[in-house]
Amino acid sequence: KKNKKVFTHGHFLRPQDVAMLSALGLNKVKVTRKVIVGLLSNGNELINPGKRKEDNKIYDSNRYSLFSLLNSNSIKVLDKGIVKDDYNKIKSQISDLKNNCDLIVISGGASSGSRDFIIKIIKEIGAIKFWKVSIKPGRPFGFGFFNKKKPILILPGNPVACFVIFFLFGEVLLNYIQGNFSYKKSFFIVKSNFSMKKKFGREEFLRGRTFVKNGIMYVNKFYKQGAGILNSLVWSNGLIRLRSNKTIIEKNSDLEFYPYER
């Protein structure tokens, strides 16, 4: 219909949207460029996959999971790799990312001995807005800005916590940067197939897997919920949200479930 709005600002163009634009006779439309995200892992103990494993070393799984999450959001990634616990090297890499990216994502520094380096550097050339949140997993999570408008995420070093925090907050922030201001994480209500107790005043996000029984969708939680247990992410198909005011979860309770796949 004439003068009818087809798409709003910030709409991500899908194949069917391109078909619609073509059917309207449009061969050109104005779009925003891809968001550039700077990625950096920090820690003396980290090595890249494919390298020979040495004592007291761990493979850097965080950067690769973040890279995959970012690619699924049509993001251009500037990967700085692993930066060891050297103040000047860390500052140099962060400064470079600050000048060339729309968003900076750092993993590792938030829960290792090097976190003081990260926080000090950001305070020197930017500002920390908050540090540590009442969420499990993911308490050592920091957020700040450079030049009052360029955000930086400091993610936990534990791989599950890193994934959960970016899944919950990073994707929302990316959509906001892209102009999709109304974006919210999607969830639906499921019935718990388990019971448990939790700490009051803290939100928890359990790794869970849904199933349908007699037309009702239930969810099981992974038997072990540690912040470093990657099996829990592989086994699950989404996150179960336990609100901060809850202390007891009874079987057949209504719970919010955030699927990994949209």
Predicted regions and their residues:
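Short, glycine/charged-enriched hinge/interface segments at domain edges or termini
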Residues: 1-79, 223, 239, 259
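Short glycine-rich anion-binding loops that position phosphate/pyrophosphate groups of nucleotides
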Residues: 44-45, 109-112, 157-159
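Short acidic loop-to-helix transition motifs that present clustered carboxylates
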Residues: 13, 82-90, 135-140
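Flexible glycine/proline-rich
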Residues: 124-262
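Short acidic, glycine/serine/threonine-rich loops at helix termini
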Residues: 18-19, 49-53, 90-92, 116-119, ...
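A generic local secondary-structure boundary/capping motif
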Residues: 9-10, 25-31, 36, 94-95, ...
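N-terminal small/polar loop signature for handling phosphorylated ligands or for N-terminal nucleophile
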Residues: 67-124
